[in-house]
Amino acid sequence: MGFGCNAAGVVATRIINSPREKLIAIITNNFSLCNGRWGTQILMATLFIGTLVNRHWSSLVSMLAVVSIVILGIGLSFFTSWLLSKTLLKGESSFFTLELPPYRPPKFWQTLYTSLIDRTLIILGRAITFAIPAGAVIWLISNIYFDGQSLALWFIQNLDNFGIFLGLNGVILLAYILAIPANEIVIPTILMLTSLVLGNNQGAGILFETEDSEIAKMLTNSGWTTLTAINLMLFSLLHNPCSTTIYTIYQETKSKKWTAIATILPLIYGFIICFLVTKIWNLIS
């Protein structure tokens, strides 16, 4: 279920009886690309990876690039599950027993209520609770100025060196900080901040959409390369969960320790892998 929504995936671990294996499932859930991250993957693959080959093959190459990220996420999920089961969460593996109960007529209204109220509206309410303040923060840092410079530009400049060290940039890092409430706003936030860096008035705290060709031109003009796009695809897979998922993890585990581990572990993976990819890319290019 994590491929649809990581928060829903965390809730779905309630069916696991073993507390140890439930924790492992919760921690590795973030390695599934949720709905909010597919847009970033597809856009980067289309604009930067697909353009490396003949246009007849560009769609196939773009698709394979996205599939590769998904496979990497699955591989890291298996690896992390194995690592946790040998270190922090040692213990005997439980057995899965499938019991077929007697047939009963479906309880339509009860199922509808449970699915709509308990599964959908509560998660949606949490998302709205975190997303509304995020919109206010994005607007404020873009429109509050000190010494003729907006707070957003100040943050970008201070994050830029670390971002370039990872094969990313300050815009991407700030966008992910601002987009903690929802992965869906990562690309609009990147475009807004990039427009701000380039000196366009369109980006003053307003999330906007534009054509793919204009996006490619804007990103290229601000120094983006194929390496930047690849690392963004990797970082989109390997970064902290959104705030709704973090809150849901805490609600399910009732533990600040495991919530912190589930939040920080993907970020550590992201930093390490982006750094290694950047070093290898620079060596062979």
Task: List where the protein language model places each region.
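Transmembrane helix-loop junctions at the membrane interface of multipass transporters and ion channels
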Residues: 17, 38-64, 247-255, 276-285
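Hydrophobic alpha-helical transmembrane segments in multi-pass membrane proteins
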Residues: 37-38, 42, 122-139, 187-188, ...
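Core transmembrane alpha-helical segments of multi-pass membrane transporters/permeases
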Residues: 95, 99, 108-143, 172
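Extended, low-charge hydrophobic alpha-helical regions
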Residues: 9-25, 135-267
